[in-house]
Amino acid sequence: MSRLRTLFLLPLLASLGSCSMVVLNPAGDVAEQQRDLLMVSTALMLIVIIPVMALTIFFAWRYRQSNREARYEPDWDHSTHLELVIWAVPLLIIICLGAVTWMGTHLLDPYRPIGRVAAGKPLPPDVRPLEVEVVALDWKWLFIYPEYGVAVVNELAAPVDRPISFRITSASVMNSFYIPALAGQIYAMPGMETRLHAVINKSGDYEGFSANYSGAGFSGMRFAFHGLDDAGFQAWIAKAKDSGGKLDRNGYLELEQPSENQPVRHYAAVDSDLYKAILNMCVEPGKMCMSEMSQIDAKGGLGMAGIRNTLPLLYDKFARRGTIFGPAPSYVASICTTEEALAASKADQSATPMTSTPIVGAGLQRPLPLSIRLPSPSATGTLRSPFNS
């Protein structure tokens, strides 16, 4: 029977061999520091967990009913030494854990530029980070390289030992950008920009994906991340430039349409202001950018005239989530002149009736004219117009 159990467990153990331990065996310095922080925190917590588990088993065995040699002290209720151990050890662990976590949180702040390439390898003073603009779409990833003027869908590459500066946003709902081998995950939100600084230290092919549910195609939001040497990275950029095609605003509006499991796509050129337009939610022609709107609001706004030139503002253009709690928010479509605003105001106030015929219901007679008899001025005094001073 024991041999059959062993044979039954062998396939299960073999299946575990295919599991990736990328979180505990990363390829980037930031991810390695996060791994170390995780291991230290776990070790500190095990100082409490292991003795508690061991003592639970020990007391259950030591003071079992059949053990007549165990001491029986029903009136025992206090021990100063035991109280000191019970409270002092967890308190010291919490202090150490808090200090380690606080320092690690600030050192690994994703908005903070990295200060080294790897452990014992400082950052060269003349190195310039690789800028990558990341856009989360439904349901794919767009990566723009402003330094090289190329854009790629569902594929990312970076040279080894060169710092990477990610600028991340979303064109639809809230999402999450995560490459376990490189660094921790960070959110991507529409109309907002998050930052991530990291570096890849080992050549290889890794996987990135969305770590935040975002709809029907969420499971297919995966992309390949390549860590390349300088020559390999330049060849990858050259391949993107040779692919042809330009990603302009019209092309982007077609690309952002919801689609699932999209193949890798390269663009040899990209509109230099495309990412800013995506971030400010003004890719559509004629739409006012959020940055322009905020500048107008900072100077006092447009007043009542501004409410006449609005169109629906849709964060999720294709599903319109969240509108059940009220009308959809709006944005200013254009700026009118003073004359145009006054003309629009007068047009709204004028109401010319289409017909003066009284409304008569089915089978009802025409209503009789209503007469009101006003009191004479001699009885009430001179009537004063509300417009007279």
Residue positions per predicted region:
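Hydrophobic alpha-helical segments
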Residues: 1-52, 59
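Structural signal for membrane-spanning alpha-helices in multi-pass inner-membrane proteins
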Residues: 13, 56, 97-101
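Non-transmembrane, membrane-proximal soluble domains of secreted or membrane proteins
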Residues: 20-38, 63-365, 369-389
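Generic alpha-helical scaffold signal
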Residues: 51-54, 75
